[in-house]
């Protein structure tokens, strides 16, 4: 069984690899325990009346697109977004971040662009970048690897776990800005197979291909924090690697997506050029939905009013007893993580 076939990472093998690693992590201190579980969007360290959230992520092979056109100024936004959007899923307010850059050469212009992007992302998420590490590893790194880690804070009585999600609850979707920072192994394979130059105009778009692919990941922190005091949020999911399967990480229920966002042009064109089906697309990409919330049915009007004009938002579906994700419009049925 191949790890990558047709530009698609084998999620089963990836999951087995990760689980094997996690099973070795047997030591835990008796104090400052992890309230959550290893493998969630973020971990929560018990600090008494409050918890500190801690998680890390990176931009993956999206950085290779940036490297190919020497345009790095949005990667920092992506890195911040990938981390803070995970942190807020439990109701945490991200407060600080450290970054890690692994490069094969020292390029001052690249450093300037990367730093600019991180600074913009920090402003958007209202966090401080308090440190980091830059490693020049020409013998190890062929391209560039960008990642970071974020800490946040949440009162213990306000932690959002998804445990009280029930049948009849409403699924709210927040629109994505495009590809965000996932699925780029598949994207790069499709682009190469179709001999599409990054400087070419992207099919069905007025922008160049690299501009479409490098559109920065949307950051949802301010919008989520604004509504937490007025809406009872039962669960949240960041739609990243694994696509819509991430929704099931909130709780093992059936999530029926009756009215998804229309996928942006980039997804439709990639699906056509890559000869992929909708099931594959929804398991790899965000398909227009970057973040999902679950609330009581009687609060849907309030949340729509609260978020109107701030971020694309819509009532996408409902929760049923069962398991997995159903998207009837596209005849897609995805198994959950459980």
Swiss-Prot record:
One of its GO terms (molecular function) is phosphoribosylamine-glycine ligase activity. Pathway: Purine metabolism; IMP biosynthesis via de novo pathway; 5-amino-1-(5-phospho-D-ribosyl)imidazole from N(2)-formyl-N(1)-(5-phospho-D-ribosyl)glycinamide: step 2/2. It comes from the Archaea. Gene3D superfamilies: PurM-like C-terminal domain, PurM-like, N-terminal domain. Keywords: ATP-binding, Cytoplasm, Ligase, Nucleotide-binding, Purine biosynthesis. Its EC number is 6.3.3.1. SUPFAM superfamilies: PurM C-terminal domain-like, PurM N-terminal domain-like. One of its GO terms (cellular component) is cytosol. The keyword Nucleotide-binding applies. HAMAP family: AIRS (MF_00741). This is Phosphoribosylformylglycinamidine cyclo-ligase. It comes from Thermoplasma acidophilum (strain ATCC 25905 / DSM 1728 / JCM 9062 / NBRC 15155 / AMRC-C165).
